[in-house]
A protein has these predicted regions:
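An amphipathic alpha-helix signature
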Residues: 38-42, 66, 118
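Acyl-donor-binding surface of acyltransferase catalytic domains
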Residues: 1-29, 34
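A conserved beta-strand-loop-helix scaffold within acyl/acetyltransferase catalytic domains
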Residues: 58-63, 69-108
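Conserved acetyl-CoA-binding loop-helix of GNAT-fold acetyltransferases
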Residues: 107, 113-128
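A generic alpha-helix structural signal
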Residues: 42-45, 69, 125
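Non-catalytic surface loops within mature trypsin-like serine protease
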Residues: 11-15, 94, 109
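Short amphipathic alpha-helix that is part of the acyltransferase structural core
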Residues: 22-57
């Protein structure tokens, strides 16, 4: 069995934080999965997770996926290009004490190493304050 290591980021905002500058920012969009479509979460988890040993939710039924993605405290953001091709996503959960937890974030394999992960992380940080 391969050992998986988890990392945690505790980030405090200051006025000195700068946004990433992304070239051709009009060629993509980051949208909220406001319809709470569990199939989006399931698709990304399986596709991205197979390369990163995400296993916990592989046994979930559609009912479990629906319950998870319907959580009113959970937001799923989707990165798409202008052709509506999926690029990546992240799930963020709000907590009572004005904290946010980044549950999952990932980029589909065809789009990795092109700066999209940095773009999503920048979006995560902007959404959390």
């Amino acid at each position: 069995m391969k050992k998986v290591q988890r990392y945690f980021l505790d980030y405090e905002f200051s006025k000195n934080n700068k946004s990433l500058e992304i070239k051709n920012e009009n060629s993509f969009k980051i949208i909220l999965n406001d319809k709470k479509n569990y199939e989006i979460n399931k698709f990304f988890y399986k596709q991205i997770g197979k390369d990163h040993f995400w296993r916990d939710r592989l046994v979930w039924t559609d009912k479990q996926w629906l319950k998870y993605s319907s959580n009113p405290l959970l937001d799923t953001w989707i990165l798409k290009d202008n052709n509506n091709d999926l690029i990546g996503y992240y799930e963020i959960e709000k907590h009572d004490n004005k904290e946010f937890e980044l549950i999952n974030m990932g980029i589909l394999s065809d789009y990795r190493s092109k700066g999209f992960g940095s773009l999503l992380l920048d979006h995560v940080l902007k959404q959390s304050y």
